[in-house]
């Protein structure tokens, strides 16, 4: 019998044994030899020599010396066959044997022979040196794996191995690259399209809001309403002259208005009545339905007092940027700031109840699968892994044990254990205050009640945000295993608790619900005070005069577009007066400044001096503000700039510009010191040239085709800055050349640059007549193309031409010659057209003649000549009666062969002479004579 092994895979040595124990042990081994062979795990390596000798000796009887030799031979053959069978079964069962080396197979084949040779020498020592130990059984799971890999499951077909050649790898990489680039292109086009749609919607909504403001402003300047408003104003306000109506006067007027008019939301509002009728009714009862009507009434009173007043509107269009990116950002904040947010959201879905898998359980399953794969690769040579598998418990039991440990020792490292094991206490104590930040967490087992959902007193400090994030990812999913809290207890807990987490964010929907605040006062008034010569804001809803900060406080956020409309309909953008974040965040949320300025251009006031003073007021207000403390704020700032934010074609001039301050050690310069530089060619397009002797103020790397080819030809110039840039202070106006002796001055390319009208050569004119160069060439007059710009397409720069440049003295001559040339061309075109029409008519007539001739020769003549031979025409009745007969005759003639001639006609042809026949055939075409 083979020696047994312990659970840890090692053999235990022992002293000498008595003969009685040996004999008893051998008798038991003879009976259980085959059973032990089946039950013990198969091993890939060969058995030791001592065990092989002991196995064979256990099959014989030591007390019978007569049959020793015969039994040895039988035992030898039996052991050899058993070992071969075991090796075959190992080859079929072990998943790793297909990858064994040939040396291992040879070693396995030679194993029985070496066993027989060493049998006699080691059989006595093996019994005395080794002790038999009870063997641990394999797990049922491993036996199932061995049974699953039976010989019947082995692949029958041959294994095909495909090797990718380098050429195929290049083709595959190329196709994948093309596919990836195409997907990127489609993604960019979709994003661009969505961006354009969102921007157009923003513009349309903005225009609609602006049109609504125009309508309300026009209603508030109706003479009837102004008369009604003037009738209710006390006399003390009307007696004050216009030059004395300052901010103090406006404050008293606002106090009287607030004390006189009230806001009553219960007033009826009829959809059939227009705004004018509604305002008349509201003034009659000294009450308004909302703040909007209150502002309109006060606007009527101010305009009735002959005060220059603006209706200021804070427009709230749809966002310029899509809300998709905002939703993604909020979801990220949810996963970071709210550690239990993902688990709480998933616990509400039905899938979360069916799949309560935790992160620890997933890790343990991965470890278990790796352990199984390693055990299969080893051929199950050891039982230590099996024992560890049996001792491994499910993840649910580990979680329960951990929770029990926490409950058993609540004061020992309480914060750390609570953060790692269960997030329930923290979520109940911190996040149960509001419905948007709280989700009912699960309890342990089936013992959930209303008390579990109610927030308890806080016993420990709230950990910092990173710690909560790390702890929540491990423990938040554990709270899903139990049953959910009852829905009836959720509103009570949310309404009763007050200590909710402000920094915790659950979902984007919760953020939107939290951000929904009542709309503010988005309209107020501005009055121009003559004594101060400035516009003063008036908020009649809150009784505020001359406080732009208060108007911003009560308005709806964000404040992006604030426009003022005066009594004449002129519009002014006054966002800079009210929005404190105008220079940083607000400008990024607005539409393109050029489009907005172009939109308001038709409504710009004619009082330019007053607008200039207002612009200076805005500039002074911005300069009074302190320097920004964040470096990112200086990027594209309208007042300040840093050197790090300068673009490729920008520079600070002069070099000794004044430093306004420092931000984290970097000098802050005024935006007026930032200038845009250009190359010589670019300045020439603006009709300016670089002065002689000027040195480039900045050198950069050019990216024109010529510059790139030059760098490719010489590798040492790869990083060389070859393009010189010049500032406006280094240039002068372009001086056009003078035409001499009827010759137009040209550039090095044989053309004339005419980017601006001021670049016209002296003594020359531009004539935009097509094909003028051909007329000038015939007359011998100099004519040059005019280059007005360049168009970039197809990867290259193409010149754009517009007419020709000629000397001024040849203008009339060329014009007359060109007109004469056009008349000749028109005459030729007319003659060509007439000739073509005449040829078409000739062809048509000739075809008709041929058709009639063919009809006379081959057509049916009997039915066509019958009505004429009878003489005279038929009546209408006769025509109707004979129509059927004529149709039958026509069908008969069409069905009968037409290539047969009448006998009379055939006799006439035979009597005709050759001359007569030739004369008759003289007018025929050659193909008709055949």
Curated annotation (Swiss-Prot):
Organism whose genome encodes this protein: Mus musculus (Mouse)
Minimal sensor domain involved in damage recognition: region residues: 600-759
Biased composition (Basic and acidic residues): 16-29, 86-106, 361-373, 899-911
Highest rank taxon of the organism: Eukaryota
Subunit structure of this chain's protein: Component of the XPC complex composed of XPC, RAD23B and CETN2. Interacts with RAD23A; the interaction is suggesting the existence of a functional equivalent variant XPC complex. Interacts with TDG; the interaction is demonstrated using the XPC:RAD23B dimer. Interacts with SMUG1; the interaction is demonstrated using the XPC:RAD23B dimer. Interacts with DDB2. Interacts with CCNH, GTF2H1 and ERCC3. Interacts with E2F1 and KAT2A; leading to KAT2A recruitment to promoters and subsequent acetylation of histones.
Bias kind Polar residues: ranges: 466-485
Ranges where the record places region Interaction with CETN2: 840-859
Subcellular location field: Nucleus; Chromosome; Cytoplasm
Residue numbers of Phosphothreonine PTMs: 165
One Gene Ontology MF term: single-stranded DNA binding
Region Interaction with RAD23B, residue ranges: 489-727
Record-listed Phosphoserine modification sites: 93, 126, 395, 397, 875-876, 883, 895
Residue ranges, annotated region (Interaction with ERCC2 and GTF2H1): 809-930
Biased composition (Acidic residues): 120-134
SMART domains: BHD_1 (SM01030), BHD_2 (SM01031), BHD_3 (SM01032)
Function field: Involved in global genome nucleotide excision repair (GG-NER) by acting as damage sensing and DNA-binding factor component of the XPC complex. Has only a low DNA repair activity by itself which is stimulated by RAD23B and RAD23A. Has a preference to bind DNA containing a short single-stranded segment but not to damaged oligonucleotides.
Any one GO BP annotation for this protein: positive regulation of DNA-templated transcription
Coarse class of the protein's main subcellular location: nucleus
Record PTM text: Ubiquitinated upon UV irradiation; the ubiquitination requires the UV-DDB complex, appears to be reversible and does not serve as a signal for degradation. Ubiquitinated by RNF11 via 'Lys-63'-linked ubiquitination. Ubiquitination by RNF111 is polysumoylation-dependent and promotes nucleotide excision repair.
Residue ranges of the region described as DNA-binding: 600-734, 760-824
InterPro entries linked: BHD_2 (IPR018327), DNA_repair_Rad4 (IPR004583), DNA_repair_Rad4-like (IPR018026), Papain-like_cys_pep_sf (IPR038765), Rad4/PNGase_transGLS-fold (IPR018325), Rad4_beta-hairpin_dom1 (IPR018326), Rad4_beta-hairpin_dom3 (IPR018328), Rad4_BHD3_sf (IPR042488)
Alphabetic keyword roster: Chromosome, Cytoplasm, DNA damage, DNA repair, DNA-binding, Isopeptide bond, Nucleus, Phosphoprotein, Transcription, Transcription regulation, Ubl conjugation
The protein, known as: DNA repair protein complementing XP-C cells homolog
